[in-house]
Amino acid sequence: MRALVSVWTDSGFAALTWENCVMILVGLVLLYLSIAKEYEPLLLLPIAFGCIMANFPNTGFEDEMGVMMAIGFGIKYEIFPPLIFMGVGAMTDFAPLIANPKTMLLGAAAQIGVFVALAGAMMLGFNVQEAASIGIIGGADGPTAIYLTSKLAPHLLGAIAVAAYSYMSLVPLIQPPIMKMCTTKEQRKIKMVNLRPVSHFEKVVFPIVVAIVVSLLLPPVAALMGCLCLGNLFEVSGVTARLSDTAQNALINIVTIFLATGTGLTMSGDKFLRLETIEIIVLGLIAFAAGTAGGVVFGQIMRIASGNKINPLIGSAGVSAVPMAARVSQVVGLKDNPSNYLLMQAMGPNVAGVIGTAVAAGTMLAQFGG
């Protein structure tokens, strides 16, 4: 009997708290959404499993000297997000942005959601570092959100990562109502001219120039932009096919496993089940909605300035959920005009949003990082 009591007291069941039970349930829900509904499964699945494992008592996952130390090292010291950006860069085609550089303005306009949420978070009592980390959810860029949060507010990493990736997966549900609210049916029918061809020289020069300019203007974000541009250079140079293939397949997949699982391991019940978590999720939705609206409204301004040659729907693609936001612009446009194909035009502001979110993060790091 004494042996049985000893086994029980040493087991996880004896130390299980209601917070652990709730977070295990949250992890199971996230697992369901990632598997059954296919909501960002490559990210939400390892986050969900990490969340479940983090809430098993007496396993060592919650100890700094345990597994969390090994995986968390890459998050704490900002190793994983730049490597993710290298893979993203290798998979990104900047040609639509190069062909129509004006769409860079739409990527910038969509960042208004970041600063709307920042202001809202400060009104709710978050300090400026926490508010900046919450605001970056509006950029719809998970690696950038993790990168900024790990520097400014690491204690909020789990909530912010889950909010960022959840809203990225819900782009097709969140954006269309906002896009329709900000446009008329006739405006959504506008057809845009085909983009001009982009030369190999332009494709090679673009990432080099972006890396130099952004890194000199905003040194805190040089790691992200440098890796993004290096990955893209692997792809467009034409001489590093093996490196490009590794960056956009093996490397990004391996790093995603560690980054997402490590993020999930930060979601222990005692840290996650707080009022501030609900506030972060709500503010993240506001940020994402404001970013979408900001892009469409600026698209309206460009439509007027161009004499109805620009469809304002492409403005919603200014958030950096690549390529989901661009696909949503195409889908909404096709519903009102079946011959209207906006995907390539929308990819311009979409990839501009990747740069814009990184620049916004760099600006906040420069201002609030001290």
Spans of model-derived segments:
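N-terminal alpha-helical transmembrane segments of multi-pass membrane transport
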Residues: 1-66
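Hydrophobic transmembrane alpha-helices of secondary-active transporters
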Residues: 30, 53, 74-98, 231-234, ...
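Interfacial helix-loop-helix linkers and transmembrane-helix boundary segments
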Residues: 36-44, 61-72, 91-106, 240-249, ...
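Alpha-helical membrane segments and immediately flanking helix-loop junctions
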Residues: 77, 85-91, 106-116, 120, ...
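Entry/N-cap segments of selected transmembrane alpha helices
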Residues: 97-118, 268-295, 346-350
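Alpha-helical transmembrane segments
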Residues: 155-173, 283-291, 314-315
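Membrane-embedded hairpin module used as a gating/binding unit in multi-pass transport
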Residues: 166-239
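Transmembrane helical segments that form the transport core of multi-pass membrane transport proteins
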Residues: 211-295
